Amino acid sequence: MTPFQAVCTALASTVGTGNIAGVAGAIAIGGAGAVFWMWVSALLGMCTKFSEVTLAVHYREKNAEGDYVGGPMYYIKNGLGKKWYWMASVYAILGSLTVLGTGNATQVNTITTSIDSALISYNVIDDAQISMVNLVIGIVIAALVAVVLLGGVKRIGTVTEKLVPFMAVFYIILAIGVVVLNADKVPHVFEMIFVGAFNPSAFTGGVVGSMFMTMRRGVSRGIFSNEAGIGTGSIAHACADTDEPVKQGMFGIFEVFADTIVICTLTALVILCGGEGIQYGVAAGAELTISGFVTTYGSWVTIFTAIAMCCFAFSCLLYTSPSPRDRSL
């Protein structure tokens, strides 16, 4: 695949649930100050992501079909030597187990939650029908993912090349609209973020009283979103048709910036500027982000937020679901 397709495929794995439900969860449990620590983790994560991607391209191999394959398991094996083969195997096994939860279950949950919210807001379904609707959604998702994955890594790259830029621009426009329409609240929101990072109880009524909790939530959600330090993003970059590892590593830096500094920040502003009263200390997900859009635009926007969130989550599913033809841990 081309370097741009590799970037889009890697972004597909990072621009997903973490940008929507993850940010909402961080703010609900850690307060607005969690956003500050998310930024800090992103700045450090840019360095980590650059190293991961550069190493992945440098130590990659060609498979039986002549395509490039790489990632942490390859640069551990080829970079550290035979005595560290066991570590490469451990990473591959743990990585396979991880995608079952963070890569698949959470993404499908976001898709069903967003579609359910849209259908309920238009009175298409009621609470009693949600289980059946979710079953149908699950079957449709499985079929769509299978169609793409059976085409191998090239088809994944082709789909994400078209889907990722569209969904990112679409979501950014919606989010910027919320910020513009609530411009008078922006200064106070940034005050909440910076002051709350070191004194979270100042804006949460004492519910969130530990700076450590705020820091932990912000850093963990930031890593969950941009995957810097996890290594999985480098697997897609290793497939890029390039002979310049360092140049591809720079794309890794851009990836973290776009994911966390831009999209996660906009999500936080949507929640803090346009959202309803936040119940601090109570776990929250995509519904908190949706409320930010609905409060500003009205219930009609739920159909558009559902489309955006489905695109985010579906693209992430494509990346984290291994292709039977080209990708394997």
Positions of the model-derived regions?
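Membrane-interface loop-to-helix entry segments
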Residues: V108-I115, M132-N182, V186-F194, S321
